[in-house]
A protein has these predicted regions:
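Flexible glycine/proline-rich, aromatic-decorated loop/lid segments
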Residues: 30-33
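Divalent-cation-assisted or electrostatically stabilized phosphate/pyrophosphate-binding catalytic cores
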Residues: 35-42
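Ribokinase/PfkB-type carbohydrate-kinase core domain
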Residues: 1-28, 43-50, 55-178
Length: 178
């Protein structure tokens, strides 16, 4: 089993990719417009979330993941790609017309003030082009991971497709639900 998860074997990770953003600041006053705190942001940290985090953790453990997911054609999608490339995660992210799923947290001191989520339920298109790309990426992988964070990438149809693919090719299948 140890050699299965060594760096020489590729692991296909399919699922919901998310950008997690943490804005750290300090509250110094209440807004005159509404009874809410005004947070002065001092530091911003962006991290990989969802299936992107799963793949990144594999890299940290000296594994070789191949990440497949969807991002929007927006700044958060670009930031996700930049983070993945910086961390050394092989990624094949399809751009679509939905916004990139992101979770932006505002933190003052040790208290999270609010979380702002940008997401739209999407259904991954089971088109022949996408399936051909998945087939090609899975070819050299010994393990398939389905990472479902409930954002729409993982549907019944794609789950069934990947389960049958793993079964028919003798690959190990791991399911990572939220």
């Amino acid at each position: 089993m140890k050699e299965l998860f060594s760096g020489t074997n590729k692991i296909f990770v399919f699922g919901d990719v998310i950008l997690d953003v943490y804005n750290f600041g300090k509250v110094e006053r209440i807004s005159p417009e509404a009874p809410v705190p005004v947070v002065h942001i001092r530091k911003v940290r962006k991290t990989l979330g969802g299936a992107a985090n799963v793949a990144n953790n594999m890299v940290k453990l000296k594994m070789t993941p191949v990440l497949f997911g969807c991002i929007g054609r927006d700044i958060h999608g670009k930031e996700l790609i930049d983070l993945l490339n910086t961390e050394g995660v092989n990624n094949y992210l399809m751009g679509d017309n939905f916004p990139t799923t992101s979770k932006v947290r505002i933190i003052a001191g040790s208290q999270q003030i609010v979380r702002v989520d940008t997401e739209e339920a999407r259904k991954f298109p089971l088109c022949s082009n996408a399936l051909s790309q998945i087939d090609a990426l899975c070819e050299d992988c010994k393990v398939l991971v389905i990472s479902d964070y409930g954002k729409g990438m993982v549907s019944f149809d794609i789950s069934r497709y990947l389960i049958l693919k793993a079964k028919d090719s003798g690959k190990i299948l791991i399911v990572d639900p939220k």
